[in-house]
Amino acid sequence: MKKAILSVSNKTGIVEFAKALTQLNYELYSTGGTKRILDEANVPVRSVSDLTHFPEIMDGRVKTLHPAVHGGILADRNKPQHLNELSEQHIDLIDMVVVNLYPFQQTVANPDVTMDEAIENIDIGGPTMLRAAAKNYKHVTTIVHPADYQEVLTRLRNDSLDESYRQSLMIKVFEHTAEYDEAIVRFFKGDKETLRYGENPQQSAYFVRTSNAKHTIAGAKQLHGKQLSYNNIKDADATLALVKKFDTPAAVAVKHMNPCGVGIGDTIEQAFQHAYEADSQSIFGGIVALNRAVTPELAEQLHSIFLEVIIAPKFTDEALDILKQKKNVRLLEIDMTIDSNEEEFVSVSGGYLVQDKDNYVVPKEEMKVVTEVAPTDEQWEAMLLGWKVVPSVKSNAIILSNNKQTVGIGAGQMNRVGAAKIALERAIEINDHVALVSDGFFPMGDTVELAAQHGIKAIIQPGGSIKDQDSIDMANKHGIAMVVTGTRHFKH
């Protein structure tokens, strides 16, 4: 029977994953809070102490730092000497390590954190197990992100958990532990940057960097311009997160944390033109992110507009010469690698909230056409583009999009009809190829009726209302194609 060690601070999906492992004939070992949760869920699990024959001591500071754990993880199974030594010491092989670390970054994000609290959230045993298992990836599967649970299970069931895939998991581990260690260094070095002011001039503010990874705002290389402001940093982060969702050339413009224009194209110049045309008024004074290098031609387009920040993976020398003619525009060079961090947090009175990032993308094949009329190919393309954008828009959110750009955005309204009115009234075009995209379900048929009055012929929404049928009936009445995704994307 294969053995797995599970010890996680982020408990998302761990019960379901553990149950599936037991069904796949894994014997589970765990520690502390993870074991308690599995016990409460009636998942068969043993204590790591059963492997080490040594109790957890010092309030859990020492529990997995033991040869019985690390010998079982590190043994090279192609070396008889290693296997003989394990046998002599009565040490079992460990086949899988599932670990994520104490929430150090979240803890030190609290401005009132004490030194003792920070120190207690420095994980020792977790990184040690992760690095040991990652080093021995040829024989051991290492999982650090809950987002990988399903893929691992699928590969276990299909007997395709091969060395190449384990190597990809190994890379994630070393990226994760490197970022974790860097966050610790930055905290104790006091790596914080005082900003001119916060969201408003009467608010003081500073920027604490917990990572300088090249794919983050904190690790961006600023090539030109004034110091980033508090609002610049927030808007730039939102802009970067959205543009990274696109594989094709894409441009995103953001104002006040909401996209005002998103465009794609065969070239980055074309993509930006589509984003600009989506709302040529609101882009003024905004933040623009591009997922391709800025060329001289694109630089001329960007130079003609007042922008606060321009983000790209690269700027050519000639493009820089053009853009630097404006002394205040901030130019940020950022790696467009997808951020591996799966959690985000926000402070509230007396504490903070932590959640997984809303990165889930519903596959098209899991979406369901619920109306008599099915979407055309062009309507599908419009829906899928809008569905990538809508999680980045404050709720209640309604987007209108075609297959190359957003054409109208209604953001942050207290009711869905109000958001739809704004999007429809501000739309640069409405025709049979434009889709209406909603971040939440329709509580009744009035939004669909309003869309029909403006000529909309395709709608995509999560579904899930007790009155879904009212919206479906209204769509059928007006010959509108409607797709439901089963997943909502509220943003507050």
Swiss-Prot record:
Q: Does the keyword Transferase apply?
A: yes
The Gene Ontology terms for molecular function here are: IMP cyclohydrolase activity; phosphoribosylaminoimidazolecarboxamide formyltransferase activity
State which pathway it belongs to.
Purine metabolism; IMP biosynthesis via de novo pathway; 5-formamido-1-(5-phospho-D-ribosyl)imidazole-4-carboxamide from 5-amino-1-(5-phospho-D-ribosyl)imidazole-4-carboxamide (10-formyl THF route): step 1/1; Purine metabolism; IMP biosynthesis via de novo pathway; IMP from 5-formamido-1-(5-phospho-D-ribosyl)imidazole-4-carboxamide: step 1/1
**Transmembrane region positions?**
none
Q: Please tell me whether the keyword Hydrolase is annotated for this protein.
A: yes
Q: Which organism is it from?
A: Staphylococcus aureus (strain bovine RF122 / ET3-1)
Reproduce the free-text note on domains from the UniProt record.
The IMP cyclohydrolase activity resides in the N-terminal region.
What name goes with this protein?
A: Bifunctional purine biosynthesis protein PurH
Q: Name one Pfam family in it.
A: MGS
What CDD domains has UniProt attached to this entry? IMPCH
One CC-aspect GO term: cytosol
Q: What UniProt keywords are attached to this protein's entry?
A: Hydrolase, Multifunctional enzyme, Purine biosynthesis, Transferase
The record's comment on protein family reads: Belongs to the PurH family.
Top-level taxon of origin? Bacteria
Q: Which residues form the MGS-like domain?
A: 1-144
